[in-house]
Amino acid sequence: VTISGLGGEPDYDQRFKMWAEDIDSSLKRAGGDANVITLTAPTREQIRARFAEVSRQAKPDDALVLMLIGHGTYDGTEYKYNIPGPDMTGTELAALLDRIPATRQLVVNMSSSSGGSIPSLQKKNRIVITATKTGTEKNATVFARYWAEALRDPAADTDKNDSVSALEAFHFAQRKTTEFFDSAKRLATEHPVIEDTGKGEGERTPSTENGEGKLASAFTVVRLGANA
């Protein structure tokens, strides 16, 4: 499920929609038995209705991927994802995810302030990737652009097994995000992190030492080439 939220102005609306469509086409091109759903600027009711549908169809041995593109806010306590009408809180998103029987879940929150959603979203067997380390990194993000790229660029497949794992996509998009700020000679306003232990804070450098990344390394997001 890919959602592009409210841009607030035409430039962002277009950008968010374009990134979501890029992801959508990569997933559909990969084929397989994936059920690809893409929502553009949906309301809370539309998101809930789609999740109810997924909940009815999903089985425990399925894998669920939720990708959020757009703007988010964080008031020091609660993260909110910006959509038309009332925004959706991290707690509400977590409740929707909890109702889906798929045991393995990946949430990629690519909005501004997305780091603030980690405490609400983290759970055993759920990988959480966010564009920002904390809720206070509130500038518009570029991570989604490079996450979309990771799902179609063979360079992201570092172990050359014709598929891109959540960890490989994270590393690729993280590196490209850093390069974006470096080449523009700008101070980085987003620091992507990953959390897949169900506890603790997001890590910028997942390793065996901090225990992060193990689940993500075994989670295939997309298959490339002949094996698709």
Please report, for each region that a protein language model flagged, where it lies by residue:
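Cysteine endopeptidase catalytic domains of the caspase/legumain-like
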Residues: 1-228
